[in-house]
Amino acid sequence: MSVLEVLKERGYIAQMTHEEEIEKLLEKEKITFYIGFDPTADSLHVGHLIQIMTMAHMQRAGHRPIVLLGGGTALIGDPSGRTDMRKMLTKEEIDRNAEAFKKQMERFIDFSEGKAIMENNAKWLLGLNYIEFLRDIGVHFTVNRMLEAEAFKTRMERGLTFLEFNYMLMQAYDFLELYRRYGCVMQMGGNDQWSNIIAGVELIRKKEGKQAYGMTFVLLTTSEGKKMGKTEKGAIWLDPKKTSPYEFYQYWRNIGDADVEKALALLTFLPMDEVRRLGRLRDKEINEAKKVLAFEVTKLVHGEEEALKAQKAAEALFEGGGEMEHVPSIEVSQDIIGRKIVDVLFEAKVIPSKSEGRRLIQQGGLYINDKRVENVDECIKEEMVKENAILVRKGKKEYHRLLVKE
């Protein structure tokens, strides 16, 4: 099975610029392709996993990925899929974020000699001469055509800054630079990047007289069309300091029944026969498929050891087996005895704010050792400490252990 057939079967592909040509190209040659990642945060998140998995599938088939870190484009901010302008970051923040992205990418992509390339578009964008850029690149873009792009259409009513309007030119120029430097003939990205990718394909044709290609992927959404990887707390991050491996595991363990097969196909390397078998499970049996999904995605992102720990923690809490030591734990001192539960949990970062803690108690959603906390002013009592620990539960499924130091 060709890599294109694999990507189609698993449900990655949204659009392609030249489907038949791409099919022949990927079968006959080993190509260089790229995907861009603007380092606008200090960690990759679940939404990036589709691009990462596609790169990994392509690399396994012998093609060479370029991971392009947007050290230059992040200074502008991509308006695609945005209803408002992104917060402007400093160059120092972007450089720090790019370094974090780089380390995370190495978990998924083999960067050994000749296998893959890591680049940063700051290398060529930051030194551009504005007049020369307009004469050399800007001349090939018509404003009429640019305004037809979905990314700009959705922003015209609310206001699109000239800064953001330049983003398409910058991304197209990236593709041209990578074509010239590395013979990169294909750009891939999320489906919200379609207009920007086409702009790059056309720029290469106009400047070099050569054919380049584009491919976009589906966005990671639930069966209800909502973005996957978002919770009440915010994004599900790939950095274990921002989202613990246990929280990460639990997110996948608790996704909707209708989303299990899609997530298994897109976010694991399990054979499709197994994916389909797991996807056919119903009622209580679907929980087995969710456990497989949670373990496989956690293993991919955090490694097998952390995935096993998360699995054991979940078993300890929800099935009465396993080991409590793997449940997310926070050390606290003995002087918590007699203090308000809300204050202690806020200081231990179990709740984001004291008002959120009070709201949780009023709604009957906070438990200490599986006993509901009834009063917002309730204090920690000595008898709550069992074997030097207090088990805290928020809602139905979020657990934390407070380890009381002697």
From Swiss-Prot:
Matching SUPFAM superfamilies: Alpha-L RNA-binding motif, Nucleotidylyl transferase
E.C. number, please?
Answer: 6.1.1.1
So what does this thing catalyse? tRNA(Tyr) + L-tyrosine + ATP = L-tyrosyl-tRNA(Tyr) + AMP + diphosphate + H(+)
How would you classify this enzyme at the top EC level? ligase
Q: GO biological process: what's one of them?
A: tyrosyl-tRNA aminoacylation
Which residues bind L-tyrosine per the record? 34, 167, 171
Binding residues annotated for ATP, in chain numbering = 230
Subunit description: Homodimer.
Which HAMAP family does the annotation name?
A: Tyr_tRNA_synth_type1
Protein name from the UniProt record: Tyrosine--tRNA ligase
